[in-house]
Amino acid sequence: MSVQRNILASLVCFIALNGFAQTADELVAKNLQAKGGVDKIKAIKSVRMTGNFDAGGFKAIVGELSKRPDMVKETFSLQGMTQVQAYDGSSGWQISPFGGRKDPEMLGEDDVRGLSEDADIDGPLVDAQAKGNKIEYLGHDQVDGDDAYKLKVTLKNGDIFYYYLDPDTYIEIQIEKQQLIRGSVRESVTMLGSYKPVNGVMYPFSIESGPKNNPDQRGKITVTKMEANVPVEDSEFKMPAAPSAPPAAKATPK
């Protein structure tokens, strides 16, 4: 009897995962609806997040400010210093005091690419076709021993994301990313949980990310505050001018 029950349970799981929502479009529609619906998602014009970062006892305060269209500013604060990376919709810049560079400087192409993806406030599943993103349904896979729907999302720039959706809620619980950087493939993974509504849209309040094949190098962000539609000027994302050098002292005539 126990064998029959196990077979029946497996069959029910198989039917649940394969008998419904088998197309990419259907899964995306269910995902967006589960997160609040496209109208509510698009009604959010800006988002401010603050959280605690922990990587094996190494702790810091992180923040992210996003605004339509395609602007983002990310901060990492530790021991009285704050690293800043930002994208204003066309170019990216940073202030990196931990590397001894306290003046703003332009970012390289690879860093800008990642920031520009973060700046998509809706994510790659919303208006995917208009953005040039290709979405494929790859069946189901395992996340920590549990079944999940798997979507492959190929961005217009060639970066690839694998979205793993909870079969009950249709919300993403894990995202894997593949990037080709200087001729080599870089893979990372992000695990998402503790979803809460903000202005009617579900956001993860637990975010653990790092190299896909090296769990020891992953860090976890626990969101402490999330605000939507906060007033913010576009100038917040523009690279500030470097401070002017003090005038050279004039030599005193003898």
Regions from the PLM with identified roles:
Residues 16-18:
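N-terminal signal peptide c-region/cleavage motif recognized by signal peptidases
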Residues 64-71, 88-91, 110-111, 166-169, ...:
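A short, sequence-level motif marking secondary-structure junctions
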Residues 25-100, 134-139:
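N-terminal mature ectodomain segment of secretory-pathway/periplasmic proteins
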Residues 81, 146-238:
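Gly/Pro-enriched, hydrophobic low-complexity segments
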